[in-house]
Amino acid sequence: HYKAVAAPSSSTVFNGVLRVEQDAQETNAFQKSSNLMLDQPGSGIPSGKVHAKPELQILADNVRCSHGATMGRLQEDAVFYLRSRGVPQDEARRILTLAFALEIVDLVPDEVLRQQMQNTLEALPSF
C-alpha cells in the first residue's frame, strides 16, 4: 500500500509493478495507491499533481490479484467537525493530513524507525 500527500504546487509519482511469475500459482496479492491532494487554504482547488500507475504483470493462471488507485481531498465534513469542536482550520487540516499519513507509519514493525518517521511527519509545516 502506497500513500502520498501532494502539497500545493507539488507532485507525486507512483509507478508500481506487481509481477507474478508462472510458477507462483495460488498467489494472493493486492496493490493500492492512495493519494491526498491538498489545496491552498481558502482556494478549494488542489494545485498539486498526482500521477499513479499501478500495474499487474500476471504470468500464472491460478492467482488472485488486484490493484487500485485513489485520489482525493480532505473531507470538508471532517474539517467542519473539528472546527465545530474549537480546532482552528489550519490545525484541523494538519490533524487530518497526519492521520492519513500515519496509517502507513503505524504498520512499520520496528518501533524506533516508526517513531522517527512519526516525528519527521509531525515536524513538517502545515499546508
What are these regions (language model features)?
Residues 1-127:
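Active-site gating/interface segments in enzymes
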